[in-house]
Amino acid sequence: MNLYIIRHADAGDPKQWQIDDAARPLSALGQKQAGALGEAFKRQGIVLQAVVSSPLVRTRQTAEGIMAALGLAGEPTFSELLEPGAMRPRKLSNELVELKVDSVAIVGHDPDMPNYLCWLLGLEQRQLYLEKSAVACVRTGKEPDKGEGTLGWLVTPEWFV
């Protein structure tokens, strides 16, 4: 399975947001990053069979921007395990297996996305950092598990924006 582990695009400064943080949308830069990431996937010939996202607004908008650039219809699949602080790596891997796909993008938050990436690669938590809109491609077997992933590549938004 190819997993594309993505931290949501730029959503501005959370300290400037006065309403419920779950409703914080992407900034203009974040909207550009999400679309550019989808365009970069297209240029590289990456075909996503599924996109799974945290239900929070900024992650949903990131996922939708990627999907729109790729011409994928419908909405992303939402997982409560991708909400901030809800990450359970093995449970998330089980959810991904249930999708019965070979290529899936996962859009979530810091520190959960880097920690899931580390779990897949067999590293201690917090050994890797994903900046906003960064993406890591991890290749796993049919059932992603701890330490069984291989890092294909990791890029920051400067690569595709």
Which residues fall in each region the model found?
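Glycine-rich phosphate-binding loop signature in dinucleotide/nucleotide-binding domains
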Residues: Q44-I46, V97-D102
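Extended, charge-rich low-complexity interaction segments
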Residues: D110-W119
